[in-house]
Amino acid sequence: MKALAALPLARRLVRRHEAHKGDSGKVLLIGGAPTMAGALLLAGRAALYSGAGYTVLLMLDEASAHVVPEQPELMVHAAARYPDPAQALVSIAPDVVAIGPGLGLDEVAQRWLEAALAWDGRLVIDADALTLLATHPHLLDALRQHPQPAALTPHPGEAARLLNTTNHAIQADRAQALQALVAHTDCIVVLKGQHSLVGAPGQEPQVCGQGNPGMAVGGMGDVLTGCLAALAAQGLRHHLTLFEATCLAVQAHALAADRLVAQGVGPVGLTPMEVAVEIRRVINS
């Protein structure tokens, strides 16, 4: 399998002197149901540190939508203010939609995923949204009919649900599982784990050589989602395909964690937010 070598793609993100925030794209992140607002906040902060021009959080927990400590740059909308999710996407007009961090699995979550799948722009799907795809065939059908391949970022458990198999089977042959996920969804897929794998229709599978056990902590995947969404948004005007943005996000995320561990920050106690900040340094270097 080909080694992931995507870091040089970051050179395409260099800002022109006359650049404005619109050039770096608008990211919409959907999730943050009650008790899970932190997942969406982590993804949002990661999007900021990864260079998104605008970052909008659509928070399903209305109470949490009014509290964003230490990150006033985030524009937070309560999902309850939008009775029609499809119209919300039209109104917000994002360049990229990322859905899943803290989304939940109830009917409200399903309605927002249906709207995201009907939207025709760049799409990143993670966490609870992947479980909804696995348990609702009509959502998987909608994903396959999306006008362009979405980027999916399952961990082994989510991958097992998508393929109706076991976590053990996924881990026993991760390369085969990646190929099966790509074929099953017709999407770009990041199979997370030790040395994450990246695959896509018509692309040679790639393996990330970076990463460490300190990344095995809740919220680390949310940071990857935010980073990927931000790079995908910038890529629209900086000539990065969604597959390229995905590869760059995976490697920058893992390298950021490795750099921190090399500095003595972890592996025990390494936090997702520390990785999000370090991603900024990786991209700019």
Task: Give the predicted meaning of each segment.
Residues 1-124, 131-151, 156, 160-285:
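Small-residue (G/A/S/T)-rich helix-start motifs and N-terminal tracts that mark the onset
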